[in-house]
Amino acid sequence: QYKEMFIVIRCKYQGKTYSRCAFIWVDKEFAIIRGQHQGYPKKLGSIQMSRPAYVGKGGPRLEVGSTFGATLGAWDRRLAEAKFTIAGDAESPGFVNAHPMLHHRWYPAIETNGQDSIEEIVTMSGYDVEIGRCFKGDFELAYFDSPVEELTSLAPKEIINGYWHEVGVSWKSGTTLARKTLPDF
């Protein structure tokens, strides 16, 4: 298991609506390699978040009025922080997971001639999706400037809603939508 923080945007490709992961940080190296194979632009980061407490007073409960927090750091810089307060149950976790993902798999060639080894546009959807408890609520989100990250370039313009949910998804393959023909050697 690992923690991740990601920014997903909606996009269209060849007339179809997709979700695209613009930024994603994970806290384990193995998650970076798998994600890059899938086309996610994963980077290593430090992610901290409140976990629900089911007994005792060691954290917030999954009930109206409880507040959860999360932070993202990378390269010894705070990049983002968030706070979510449960307002009530939700039927679903919004539209973030409602569309298939669209990714760009790109790897430069080992030569320094400007050629690429891989350049593809791919899509994928999970299977065996299981959604657990889901809550909607109020949230606050703040991004911070960094000399090496560009997260502030996608600052929110409109707040739609906040969600907290449990989800399990499996993945095994995707579909290549476009592949740039690479030069022969």
What is the meaning of each model-derived region?
Residues Q1-Q36:
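Glycine-rich, compositionally biased intrinsically disordered regions
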Residues Y40-F185:
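Interaction-surface and assembly-scaffold signal
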